[in-house]
Structure formats: C-alpha cells, structure tokens
C-alpha cells in the first residue's frame, strides 16, 4: 500500500477543502497542544491520504506535491465540484489516447491533483 502524505500551512482548512471539493472523508485528526493538526487520515477514493501542518524545521516540507486519483464516476461532475469549492482547474476534463478521462487542478495551497478514470493494469 502507498499512502501519499501532504503538509499544509493550514491543515484544518485543507481538510475542509478536501472534503468539500474532492469528496474525501475525514477519518482521524490529531491536534498538538498548540491546536494545529499534527496528523490526519483521510479516506480518498478507495485509498488513504495522510496530512499534517507544515513546520519550518521539518525535513519533509520540501515543496508542493502531485498525485493522480482514480475515481469511479463522472469526471466532469467531479471537476465542477472541485472548481466550486475553490480548486484552480488548469486542465479541463479530457479523453486520453491511452484510455480514461481526467482533469488536473491545484488545491488552495498549490498542490497538484489529477482525477480520472484511467487505472493501470497488470494484464
């Protein structure tokens, strides 16, 4: 299992955006004594995403992230939901030559997300 991990300047706002914009589901949120998100677990399209609050002294905060999420359902509707929640859609839903349909956007902190129906197979 591979679990992408993100660090956000405002992890509370990121969790709210991921729920509203992408339809992800909050599983657990652990806050530090200072009230910031130390660790959170989000259910995402049949998989998981972990996230926390960025810290200036952390070796993990090296820049923005990018991930492709395979979704079941209407890519165009997913794109519109994300856009309505504030995602910056920079590549509209497109049918790909290799199969599937997908789009790409940035969340409010600049991480790149692509959502689509293409899933690699072993066959």
Give, region by region, the residue ranges found by the protein language model:
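Vicinal oxygen chelate
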Residues: 1-5, 15-108, 115-123
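Conserved beta-strand-loop-alpha-helix junction that forms the acyl-donor binding cleft
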Residues: 8-10
């Amino acid at each position: 299992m591979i679990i992408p991990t993100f660090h956000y300047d405002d992890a509370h706002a990121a969790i709210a955006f991921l729920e509203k914009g992408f339809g992800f589901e909050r599983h657990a949120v652990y806050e530090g004594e200072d009230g910031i998100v130390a660790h959170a677990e989000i259910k995402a399209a049949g998989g998981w995403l972990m996230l926390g609050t960025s810290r200036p002294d952390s070796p993990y905060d090296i820049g923005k992230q990018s991930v492709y999420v395979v979704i079941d359902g209407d890519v165009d509707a997913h794109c519109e939901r994300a856009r309505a929640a504030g995602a910056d859609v920079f590549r509209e839903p497109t049918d790909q030559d290799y199969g599937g349909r997908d789009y790409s956007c940035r969340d409010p902190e600049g991480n790149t997300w692509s959502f689509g129906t293409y899933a690699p197979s072993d066959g």
